[in-house]
């Protein structure tokens, strides 16, 4: 069974076909809620859309929402992705299994959404005081790694951040 996508390419329908093995700490969840949060121009919307598209290629149901707010003017915005093995009843994120925070305001402002066993992944250059919570936290200097390894800070930061998220999920 296949379906035609907006791009015109045929791909297996959701829930059919082989699924790649997932090995990260959140891989075995039937429903996974992720929030990407940061300031304007950090790529949080693009990261959410990219993760949602990747999850559909993994034959999973996906809901993706985003809030721009004042993010494009220096405030912070977010992109939420809900990934499930079953149809999604409610597309808005209520609690998060994974919070990806690219700035201090986002980490502080959204940490309360994390489930007790949740995971916080943050940019350790921009989040100098990670919020305390019961789950696990991983600080990664995404921007510095991107610049040192590739020489391009902005776009490569998005790729590195998504790579960390894919490994966890």
Feature roles, as predicted:
Residues 2-169:
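Active-site cofactor/cluster-binding pocket
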């Amino acid at each position: 069974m296949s379906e035609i996508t907006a791009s015109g390419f045929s791909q297996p329908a959701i829930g059919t076909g082989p699924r790649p093995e997932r090995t990260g700490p959140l891989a075995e969840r039937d429903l996974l809620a992720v929030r990407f949060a940061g300031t304007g121009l950090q790529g949080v919307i693009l990261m959410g859309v990219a993760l949602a598209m990747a999850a559909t290629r993994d034959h999973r149901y996906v809901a993706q929402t985003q809030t721009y707010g004042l993010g494009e003017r220096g405030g912070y915005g977010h992109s939420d992705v809900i990934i499930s093995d079953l149809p999604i009843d409610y597309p808005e994120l209520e609690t998060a299994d994974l919070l990806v925070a690219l700035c201090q305001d986002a980490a502080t402002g959204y940490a309360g959404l994390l489930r007790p066993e949740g995971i916080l992944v943050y940019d350790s250059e921009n989040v100098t005081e990670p919020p305390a919570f019961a789950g696990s936290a991983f600080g990664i200097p995404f921007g510095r790694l991107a610049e040192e390894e590739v020489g391009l800070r902005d776009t490569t930061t998005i790729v590195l951040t998504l790579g960390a998220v894919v490994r966890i999920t």
